[in-house]
Structure formats: C-alpha cells, structure tokens
C-alpha cells in the first residue's frame, strides 16, 4: 500500500551518497578513476531549487515536479565533481521508489532522447531553461509506473 504522504525534503547526504554509489559502480565496471567530491555552492543551489517545488497538494503532480527537478537541476548546476547526469537519474528514480512509483527508462547510454534533453540543460549557463524542464517533465511523466515491492 502506497502512503498518501510524500517523502518531501531531499538532503545533501541523500544526493552525495547516491553520487558516490554511482561513481564507485562506474569505476568497478570500467576501471576509470572516480572523482568524488561536492561543489558546495552548487549543491546549496540544487537543494534550494529541489525543495521549493512540489507543493500543489496533488501527489502525482508534486512527485513529477520534484523528480523532474532532481534530475534537471543536478544536470544543470553540476554539484558533483563527476557523474552528475547519472546521479540525477538514479536519485530521481530512488525518490520516486521511496514514494511508491518507479521510473522506467532505458540506460542513459541507449537513451538518445533523454541524453539530448539533459545536454540542453547542461549547456544553459545562467538560467534553468523552463521549456527544456517541461520537456523533461513530459519525458518522465511517460515513464512513471506504480511500484510494488517484492514480498
């Protein structure tokens, strides 16, 4: 049974641990070095932006908005030394799973549509492109499914 309450606040530790797991898994798979570290100014901005959305009172709409911001804002502001897109994808998926949903997407290296959207976000220097965020939100909305944990 899925709760009506949303796990709302995203904390730095949640994102940092996700980034470390992503990078260590990548290092194990490829043998490439893992550059683990946080750019604090960017992290502060990411957390502020993520935690200031998702307050409409409509659970599905709020979950979609928060997941979109987790993935989009991490990609845009680059709070980590490495692995920002991968961390955004995994963190958005974990957030949705914690709230009773799953994000059903192909691995990033096979997913040209997602890669294109995230590249557009990353290339914005001064402001977060709201049109691209709408595209990302639509992309995510088409891939959210109810999550039933195995018993």
Regions found by a protein language model. Give the residues of each.
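FIC/Doc superfamily catalytic core
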Residues: 1-151
């Amino acid at each position: 049974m899925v709760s009506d309450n949303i796990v709302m606040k995203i904390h730095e530790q949640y994102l940092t641990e996700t980034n470390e797991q992503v990078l260590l898994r990548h290092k194990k798979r490829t043998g490439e070095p893992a550059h683990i570290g946080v750019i604090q100014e960017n992290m502060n901005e990411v957390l502020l932006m993520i935690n200031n959305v998702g307050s409409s009172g409509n659970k599905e709409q709020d979950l979609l908005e928060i997941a979109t911001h987790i993935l989009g804002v991490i990609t845009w502001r680059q709070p980590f030394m490495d692995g920002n897109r991968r961390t955004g994808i995994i963190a958005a998926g974990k957030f949705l799973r914690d709230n009773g949903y799953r994000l059903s997407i192909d691995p990033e290296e096979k997913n040209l549509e997602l890669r294109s959207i995230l590249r557009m976000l990353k290339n914005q220097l001064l402001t977060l492109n709201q049109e691209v965020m709408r595209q990302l939100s639509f992309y995510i909305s088409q891939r959210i499914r109810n999550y039933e944990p195995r018993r």
